[in-house]
Amino acid sequence: MKFGVIVFPGSNCDQDVHYALGSVLGQNVDYLWHGDTSVSGYDCLILPGGFSYGDYLRAGAIARFAPIMPAVIDFARSGGLVLGICNGFQILLEAGLLPGAMMRNACLQFRCQWTCLKVDNNATPFTNRFREGQVVRIPIAHGEGNYYADAATLAQLEANRQIIFRYCSPDGEVTPAANPNGSVGNIAGIINREGNVLGMMPHPERCAEGILGGSDGRELLASIVDWWERGERLGA
């Protein structure tokens, strides 16, 4: 399987993602520069965390207009797998590949900590190694991770099982106390209706080896590989 990690000016998690995919999982992975205009030949694209273009205007607002983004949008709309992590999630929202918007954390502070996430849907290319309802530990590091969507959009996300991760307590209770940023419904990650584009604020690449304090992130990335190697394709 061949991955492309897109590097924007200000990205700072691209090397971690590259290491997790290449060195930990042994996959073929390349860096793609924001100025590239083609993503041909890749099976999965990853938009990593960081502060693309300094987060000026809004997080992800300028990156959405980078030269590579039309190719990313076409890739996603043709069924290609896309994972946006933290700033990558924000870019996917700005690009219209996922519904909703990101606001500043409700506490108005940058939050860097481990979080517990409840897996709400494991029937996706990104979560098939997890059990539905399983609690996983994946860290966050963001100042604008407060996900918002209007009531109609939230109802659609619920009805279509597009909410993939919710912040929760260690025993799986979805409570306000477990919510680090004020996200509506404790939402930590969502998928598009077609099931091929996932955006999440927590960083799976930061917990891909036990030496980092946990390996739940490895299971997410390995889910993509397993799904691909089984020959599964969305809409097939």
From Swiss-Prot:
It is found in: Cytoplasm. One of its GO terms (biological process) is 'de novo' IMP biosynthetic process. CDD domains: GATase1_FGAR_AT. Disulfide bonds: none annotated. SMART domains: GATase_5. Pathway: Purine metabolism; IMP biosynthesis via de novo pathway; 5-amino-1-(5-phospho-D-ribosyl)imidazole from N(2)-formyl-N(1)-(5-phospho-D-ribosyl)glycinamide: step 1/2. It comes from the Bacteria. The keyword Protease does not apply. Its EC number is 6.3.5.3, 3.5.1.2. It catalyses: N(2)-formyl-N(1)-(5-phospho-beta-D-ribosyl)glycinamide + L-glutamine + ATP + H2O = 2-formamido-N(1)-(5-O-phospho-beta-D-ribosyl)acetamidine + L-glutamate + ADP + phosphate + H(+); L-glutamine + H2O = L-glutamate + NH4(+). Keywords: ATP-binding, Cytoplasm, Glutamine amidotransferase, Hydrolase, Ligase, Nucleotide-binding, Purine biosynthesis. InterPro entries: Class_I_gatase-like, PRibForGlyAmidine_synth_PurQ. One of its GO terms (molecular function) is glutaminase activity. The keyword ATP-binding applies. Pfam families: GATase_5. The active site is at 86 (nucleophile), 203, 205. One of its GO terms (cellular component) is cytoplasm. Residues 3-234 form the Glutamine amidotransferase type-1 domain. Part of the FGAM synthase complex composed of 1 PurL, 1 PurQ and 2 PurS subunits. Part of the phosphoribosylformylglycinamidine synthase complex involved in the purines biosynthetic pathway. Catalyzes the ATP-dependent conversion of formylglycinamide ribonucleotide (FGAR) and glutamine to yield formylglycinamidine ribonucleotide (FGAM) and glutamate. The FGAM synthase complex is composed of three subunits. PurQ produces an ammonia molecule by converting glutamine to glutamate. PurL transfers the ammonia molecule to FGAR to form FGAM in an ATP-dependent manner. This is Phosphoribosylformylglycinamidine synthase subunit PurQ.
